[in-house]
Amino acid sequence: MSLDMNVAVDVRRIQLALDELGTVTRDRAIPRVMAAALLSSTEQAFERQADPDTGKGWEAWSDSWLAWRQDHGFVPGSILTLHGDLARSITTDYGQDYALIGSPKIYAAIHQWGGTPDMAPRPAGVPARPYMGLDKTGEQEIFDAIRKRVSAALRQ
């Protein structure tokens, strides 16, 4: 005696869930959250005067820069803030597959990554004081948004 057994499984709900998961990577909601988190982390870096990625405080002013600031009435003050132009210049952008943060200020890069005494057009021995980045709070906001979006997609 033989027994043939067939099981039919309706996979439409599974296919719909997979299709909905695919939309998670194609919408702009997550990159928008990422851009906002980058901006918030950067704003906090200026407040804390610390690298947003590591939390390490920025190097203090050089003696010559401190003297210049004192002579011109800019002490006390924040390390990367003279008039606030750099902090105000921060912009973000995002799209389906990216989130960006930056500044159009010509001096933005040297403050982020530092400079060397032999750099052209003149000596630029400036220590790196990273201000753009992603702190732990921003990272958590992004992960929470991803979890929420994926969870919503799977409930479909």
Curated annotation (Swiss-Prot):
InterPro entries xrefs: Phage_virion_morphogenesis
Alphabetic keyword roster: Host cytoplasm, Late protein, Viral capsid assembly, Viral release from host cell, Virion
Superkingdom assignment: Viruses
Keyword Transferase assigned: no
Protein localization: Virion; Host cytoplasm
Claim: ATP-binding is one of the keywords in the record: no
A GO CC term assigned to this protein in UniProt: virion component
Stimuli inducing this protein: Expressed in the late phase of the viral replicative cycle. Expression of late genes is activated by the viral late transcription activator C.
Pfam families: Phage_tail_S
Entry function: Involved in capsid assembly.
Protein name: Putative capsid assembly protein G
Lineage: Viruses, Duplodnaviria, Heunggongvirae, Uroviricota, Caudoviricetes
UniProt gene name: G
